[in-house]
């Protein structure tokens, strides 16, 4: 099957985002901006302890305070929640026990902020403090108190999987090396703070939430379950959103609490979270220890791989089961590896819950693998770019041992592109002392083909409505979180219909108006919603072509649509304008509404015979190669990235402008994890709950990032497209790791490569000299 090729000049064109004007002019309304003059102020009381039993809560003084309208505790939230139906163990407000410092215990709604804060201070909670475990080692130690009764060893999930004969493959290897790497816990640091505006109509028993989410559908499900409401009485709207990066792919406690307060107060509650509270809500990438073992043949071919990954997952399950499976799932699909062994442990700790973050579950193990592969290649005398070329997939299509199907694979071209752009052959190993080059590969899924809450319905649905004015309304439940999905859906629909982009307006992520969608996570929207948009547009085009053919007294197959004109192929007749055809089409039906859907074929949904293969199952992979040029100050230990060349295989760049922006953002987030970002706790307290202490790179630290688009034309993607946002992130870490080694001769095993870590390595090198 070949992808549909664009013909009308809408797809493949650098296109500003359709909502860009509102954003840059300040007209965009984010959740905190929505007018609600009668809204009460919501506030949350949080645990001061990392681990404790709740013996008693007295809210009487808070309830008696003038201006307090509602007070809620865990007694009113008996239903647990969690993003995975098989692991729901978090309560909106803690019941019986708190498991991290910041765990919500009670909440109030009051007439103003001052009153709300006073009310929180009046709530008395009696705790029995318990030992707290900040690391997997401490949590798994014999005698440690279980955070959750059903997991007495504090291990949420163990994974043990083997593909191929690993022992035999290692026995045949000529070079075997093993190394352990650690990766600090990191946070998304999205620009917009968490916020929910909850409006309850007691007459109609209707609850409306405007909230900062990537997946309105999940919020809808969790609010309905925890509040024990009929889901038909709930409406969830995602206004403009200032980023997500995975943090907002779950229904979170503050959203449920806002709904609870609004219902109890019988009114409207605005619950705005501070930057510290937004950090505490967390869902970041967990601290991970990776023990990586690779066997190579003399010619550089990979014989076998064995990895062990241990993650500190935080206090609740969240995405943990999926995250730990992903540590091994994406060892497949990038290189040809005949034998793979994957052992992993996701461990509960008394810290805020971790979750999904850009490159979900794969970044740390990919970085460890790439770093060790580079080091072993050097030991064999093989250039780090060359050793990657040696291990490419042998043919396409390719089915991995994990049952993933690779239908497009632009990695060889990506490597050639960065090789040429960076001057690799001319400059590698020849830069001045203190400066170096490094290279790495990475990849990620174009959406998971096995949704988390799925009853067999299509993976994506898009509706198109055409009325008398000739305007086309595209309705999608997909959440545009800044990545440009509204623009993408408009572009592909306009391309199919042969109309101007300006003719299409998008309504998205409103459960009362738009079809259900599984949301913006795992880079699924372009592939799935894009294909559904094409399906809907083809349906609408069929209606219009039929009307035009009837009007022009021609066969439907002879009708062409060019620049909004419907013409008979080969005829000199000027044809009909779009508006004329709309008028003709509406004669019989009135307003025209059509539906388009997309469903991933079953062969792309994993293999039931392979345990866990639903995780990592996808329609296609985005691939990336990147070269990083960096320098190291040997006095301060500061690592500076000067230039990044990144070639990214996106199948087809539907909007090259957006692809470049998303790729640069992915590289930039990789740089943060590689060089400076780190979550630190002091007796359970997050010590960096602000963007001054949490070291996100600024524009000052950002290098020049040259994006090179590679188009492998995936046969199943919309016009050949795949994801273009996550596949490049992981490669930055091992690429700069190699650049640092070339610059000053030290190889770190702990990330980030912060000045203190680098100076320690330099001091040790000097002492050993």
Swiss-Prot record:
InterPro entries to which the protein is assigned, alphabetical: 4hydrxbenzoyl-CoA_Rdtase_asu, Ald_Oxase/Xan_DH_a/b, Ald_Oxase/Xan_DH_a/b_sf, Ald_Oxase/xanthine_DH-like, AldOxase/xan_DH_MoCoBD1, AldOxase/xan_DH_MoCoBD2, AldOxase/xan_DH_Mopterin-bd_sf
Catalysis: reaction(s): oxidized 2[4Fe-4S]-[ferredoxin] + benzoyl-CoA + H2O = 4-hydroxybenzoyl-CoA + reduced 2[4Fe-4S]-[ferredoxin] + 2 H(+)
The keyword Oxidoreductase belongs to this UniProt entry's keyword annotation: yes
Signal peptide (UniProt feature, chain positions): none
Record entry for activity regulation: Inactivated by low concentrations of cyanide in vitro.
Post-translational modification: The N-terminus is blocked.
Enzyme class: oxidoreductase
GO MF, one example: 4-hydroxybenzoyl-CoA reductase activity
SUPFAM superfamilies hit by this protein: CO dehydrogenase molybdoprotein N-domain-like, Molybdenum cofactor-binding domain
Gene3D superfamilies recorded: Aldehyde oxidase/xanthine dehydrogenase, a/b hammerhead, Aldehyde oxidase/xanthine dehydrogenase, molybdopterin binding domain
Keyword Hydrolase assigned: no
Domain of life: Bacteria
Keywords: Molybdenum, Oxidoreductase
Transmembrane segments: none
Essential cofactor(s): Mo-molybdopterin cytosine dinucleotide
EC number, as in UniProt: 1.1.7.1
Positions annotated to bind Mo-molybdopterin cytosine dinucleotide: 214, 244-245, 522-526, 650-655, 722-725
Bound cofactor: record note: Binds 1 Mo-molybdopterin cytosine dinucleotide (Mo-MCD) cofactor per subunit.
Chain's role: Component of a complex that catalyzes the reductive dehydroxylation of 4-hydroxybenzoyl-CoA to benzoyl-CoA. Reaction is not reversible. Is a key enzyme in the anaerobic degradation of phenolic compounds.
Family label: Belongs to the xanthine dehydrogenase family.
Known partners and oligomeric status: Heterohexamer of two alpha, two beta and two gamma subunits.
NCBIfam families: 4hydrxCoA_A
The name this protein goes by in its record: 4-hydroxybenzoyl-CoA reductase subunit alpha
Organism of this sequence: Thauera aromatica
């Amino acid at each position: 099957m070949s992808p549909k090729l664009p013909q009308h000049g809408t797809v493949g064109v650098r296109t500003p985002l359709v909502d860009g004007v509102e954003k840059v002019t300040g007209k965009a309304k984010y959740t905190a901006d929505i007018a609600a003059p009668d809204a009460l102020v919501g506030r949350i009381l949080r645990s001061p302890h990392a681990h404790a039993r709740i013996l008693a809560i007295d809210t009487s003084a808070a309830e008696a305070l003038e201006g307090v309208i509602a007070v809620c505790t865990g007694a009113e939230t008996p239903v647990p929640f969690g993003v995975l139906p098989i692991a729901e163990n978090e309560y909106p407000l803690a019941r019986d026990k708190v498991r991290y410092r910041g765990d919500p215990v009670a909440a109030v709604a009051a007439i103003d902020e001052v009153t709300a804060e006073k009310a929180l201070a009046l709530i008395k909670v009696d705790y029995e403090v318990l030992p707290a475990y900040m690391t997997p080692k401490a949590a798994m130690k014999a005698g440690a108190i279980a955070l959750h009764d059903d997991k007495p060893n504090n291990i949420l999930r163990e994974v043990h999987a083997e593909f191929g004969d690993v022992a035999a493959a290692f026995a045949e290897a000529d070079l075997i090396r093993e190394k352990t790497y650690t990766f600090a816990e990191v946070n998304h640091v999205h620009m917009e703070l968490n916020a929910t505006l909850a409006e309850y109509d007691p007459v109609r028993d209707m609850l409306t939430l405007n909230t900062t989410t990537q997946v309105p559908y999940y919020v809808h499900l969790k609010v309905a379950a925890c509040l024990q409401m009929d889901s038909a009485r709930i409406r969830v709207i995602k206004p403009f959103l200032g980023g997500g990066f995975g943090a907002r792919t779950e229904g979170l406690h503050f959203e449920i609490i806002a709904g609870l307060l609004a219902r109890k107060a019988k009114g409207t509650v605005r619950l705005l979270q501070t930057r510290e509270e937004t950090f505490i809500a967390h869902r970041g990438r967990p601290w991970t220890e990776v023990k990586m073992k690779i066997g190579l043949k003399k010619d550089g071919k990979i014989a076998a791989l064995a990895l062990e990954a241990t993650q500190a997952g935080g206090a609740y399950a969240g995405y943990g089961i999926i995250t730990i499976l992903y540590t091994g799932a994406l060892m497949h699909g990038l290189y040809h590896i005949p034998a793979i062994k994957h052992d992993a442990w996701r461990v509960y700790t008394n810290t805020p819950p971790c979750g999904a973050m850009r490159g979900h579950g794969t970044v740390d193990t990919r970085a460890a693998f790439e770093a060790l592969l580079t080091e072993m290649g050097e030991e064999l005398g093989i250039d780090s770019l060359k050793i990657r070329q040696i291990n490419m997939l042998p043919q396409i299509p390719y089915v991995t041992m994990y049952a993933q199907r690779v239908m497009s694979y632009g990695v060889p071209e990506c490597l050639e592109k960065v090789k040429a752009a960076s001057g690799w052959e001319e400059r590698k190993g020849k830069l001045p002392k203190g400066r170096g080059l490094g290279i790495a590969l990475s990849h990620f899924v174009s959406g998971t083909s096995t949704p988390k809450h799925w009853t067999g319905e299509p993976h994506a649905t898009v509706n198109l409505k055409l009325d008398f004015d000739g305007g086309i309304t595209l309705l999608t439940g997909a959440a545009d979180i800044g990545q440009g999905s509204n623009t993408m859906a408009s572009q592909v629909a306009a391309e199919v219909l042969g109309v101007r982009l300006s003719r299409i307006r998008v309504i998205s992520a409103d459960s009362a108006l738009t079809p259900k969608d599984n949301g913006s996570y795992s880079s699924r929207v372009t592939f799935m919603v894009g294909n559904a948009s094409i399906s809907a547009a083809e349906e609408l085009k069929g209606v219009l072509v039929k009307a035009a053919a009837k009007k022009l007294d021609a066969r439907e197959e002879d009708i062409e649509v060019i620049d909004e004109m419907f013409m008979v192929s080969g005829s000199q007749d000027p044809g009909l304008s779009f508006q004329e055809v709309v008028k003709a089409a509406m004669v019989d039906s009135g307003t025209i509404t059509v539906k388009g859907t997309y469903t991933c074929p079953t062969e792309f949904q994993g293999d039931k015979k392979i345990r866990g293969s639903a995780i990592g199952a996808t329609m296609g992979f985005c691939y990336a190669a990147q070269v990083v040029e960096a320098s190291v100050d040997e006095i301060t230990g500061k690592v500076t990235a000067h230039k990044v060349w990144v070639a990214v295989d996106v199948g087809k760049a539907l909007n090259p402008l957006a692809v470049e922006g998303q790729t640069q953002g992915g590289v930039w987030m990789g740089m943060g994890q590689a060089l400076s970002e780190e979550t630190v706790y002091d007796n359970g307290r997050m010590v960096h709950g602000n963007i001054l202490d949490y070291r996100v790179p600024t524009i000052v630290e950002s290098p020049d990032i040259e994006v090179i688009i590679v188009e492998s034309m995936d046969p199943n993607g919309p016009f050949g497209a795949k994801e273009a946002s996550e596949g490049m992130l992981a490669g930055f870490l091992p690429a700069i790791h190699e650049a640092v080694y070339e610059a000053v001769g030290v190889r770190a095993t702990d990330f980030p490569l912060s000045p203190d870590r680098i100076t320690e390595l330099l001091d040790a090198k000097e002492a050993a000299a």
